[in-house]
Amino acid sequence: AAKNFVTYEGRIYGFATPSAIAGNEGLLVRKDWLDKLGLKAPTTLDELYDVLYAFTYNDPDGNGKNDTYGYGAFVEETVSYEIYPGRRFEPLMGAFGVEGTWNMTASNFGLRIHEASYYDWMVFFKKCIDAGVIDPNWQSYKKDDFRAAWKQGKFGVFREQNSAYASENNYSPFDANFPNGGFIVVDAPIGPNGAQSVGPKCQGMSVYAISDDVTPQQGAKIGG
């Protein structure tokens, strides 16, 4: 696959080295909040909505205050060239089959936003916004704000990089704030028509071009 990435009409124009990991993000849920409210881990979109609602209005942290939300997110810088509202919402968008900016299938190639099911996603998104189950600061949060918020227990469901979630810089402050708190990684919710995705897996490539100074013999040796 890496070789095909730099091959055009039978000619190899460089080296392509794939990244080690194609996808390293998952959907996290506060396990202690589920237990506190007597809820099970959600598997469908409807179940997830019920969890988001309960996390927002049923005092999952037990502090007697109305200070939690169901879902948390932030708008990444990549949203300038990716579909809005961005990657943090793709586990929800995936329930409608419209995760990612592009539909890369040969039969339906094109922008996701033009697909009929994208409207269904927007209806669900508006439902969540109107119900107040998404932390309203998602439009202003930067990445550091978003991570500070989940470490402070502001919301109980979010998409996060596994490496960031497992980083001592992140879990140590969370553990200090919530000694009995914890997360589980769950599958993305299954939508009304059976669609499910935490987000597209796009493996990055490092490309090293071959100089014009390379002789055909050297090029053949390099290309293998």
PLM feature spans:
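Extracytoplasmic/secretory soluble proteins
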Residues: 1-224
